């Protein structure tokens, strides 16, 4: 009988837990998210804006970072197999950052800084061993996104749904606060007015070098982790709910 009376409490506890982690807003979106390979991360380890270098990770994957005040960063390393010649895969590295907006209907829009996006395309069987390095600018629209606790890994999971509703591969929370390059225009284009090139929202090469150098020096000091502001957003609530369910089930079976 005690087990039967406990079941409504257990159900409410699980509902409360799911409600606590189900808010799809800028606060819950903030952080660095990485795909299953766990090898691709945004930040200075992927792109060096001073020397214009895209750094190839150990494995393909994608990563997105978001701040609470509306900035994003994107890192992609994709490899496409060549079915006609397995020794000729194509690979592409893509870096973008800029601003994002969450609409009232839950749509997520990413608008990159046009001059900062970079792409490195490698086609070893057709480019004579010389990869193509170019600017890249592609706005992105995600119809919706969902943040939850992954049932298998027990960590936060971000599911982005593309403009047509098809799901992107799931991303998992790697850092919070996010690991990102400065949220300003890193490589402003030259203008006739020298003050415009180092104006508001941009930095000079010298100051940019100092910023990136500091980020690199602090790379292994800023392994940010989730900060919990209360019991309702704590992962311990998951274990408490699981334990209570287990106890309730045992009492129900033996009552």
Swiss-Prot record:
Keyword Endoplasmic reticulum tagged: yes
What does the UniProt entry say about where the protein is found? Endoplasmic reticulum membrane
**What name does UniProt use for this protein?**
Protein ROT1
Source species, domain of life: Eukaryota
Which residue windows are transmembrane per the record?
231-251
What's the name of its gene?
Answer: ROT1
The UniProt entry, under InterPro entries, shows: Rot1
Keyword annotations for this protein, in alphabetical order, are: Endoplasmic reticulum, Glycoprotein, Membrane, Signal, Transmembrane, Transmembrane helix
Give the originating organism: Vanderwaltozyma polyspora (strain ATCC 22028 / DSM 70294 / BCRC 21397 / CBS 2163 / NBRC 10782 / NRRL Y-8283 / UCD 57-17)
As for membrane topology, the entry says:
Single-pass type I membrane protein
Gene Ontology cellular component terms for the protein in this record = endoplasmic reticulum membrane
Biological processes, Gene Ontology terms: 'de novo' protein folding; budding cell apical bud growth; establishment or maintenance of actin cytoskeleton polarity; fungal-type cell wall biogenesis; protein folding in endoplasmic reticulum; protein N-linked glycosylation; protein O-linked mannosylation
User: Would I find DNA damage among this entry's keywords?
Assistant: no
Which residues are on the Cytoplasmic side of the membrane? 252-255
Show which residues constitute the signal peptide: 1-22
Its taxonomic placement starts with: Eukaryota, Fungi, Dikarya, Ascomycota, Saccharomycotina
């Amino acid at each position: 009988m005690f087990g039967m009376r406990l079941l409504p409490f257990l159900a409410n506890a699980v509902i409360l837990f799911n409600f606590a982690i189900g808010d799809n807003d800028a606060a819950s979106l903030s952080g660095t998210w990485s795909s299953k390979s766990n090898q691709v991360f945004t930040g200075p380890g992927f792109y060096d804006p001073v020397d214009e270098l895209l750094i190839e990770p150990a494995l393909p994957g994608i990563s997105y970072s978001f701040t609470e005040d509306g900035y994003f960063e994107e890192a992609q390393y994709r490899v496409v197999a060549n079915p006609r010649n397995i020794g000729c895969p194509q690979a592409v590295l893509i870096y973008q950052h800029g601003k994002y907006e969450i609409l009232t209907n839950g749509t997520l829009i990413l608008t990159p800084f046009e001059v900062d996006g970079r792409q490195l395309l490698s086609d070893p069987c057709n480019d004579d061993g010389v990869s193509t390095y170019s600017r890249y600018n592609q706005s992105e629209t995600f119809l919706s996104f969902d943040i939850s606790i992954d049932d298998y890994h027990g960590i936060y999971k971000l599911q982005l749904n593309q403009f047509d509703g098809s799901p992107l591969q799931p991303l998992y929370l790697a850092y919070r606060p996010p690991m990102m390059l400065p949220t300003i225009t890193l490589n402003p284009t030259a203008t006739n007015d020298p003050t415009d090139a180092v104006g508001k929202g941009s930095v000079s090469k010298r100051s940019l070098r100092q910023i990136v150098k500091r980020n690199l020096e602090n790379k292994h000091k800023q392994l940010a982790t989730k900060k919990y502001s209360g019991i309702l957003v704590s992962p311990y609530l998951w274990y408490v709910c699981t334990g209570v369910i287990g106890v309730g089930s045992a009492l129900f079976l033996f009552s």
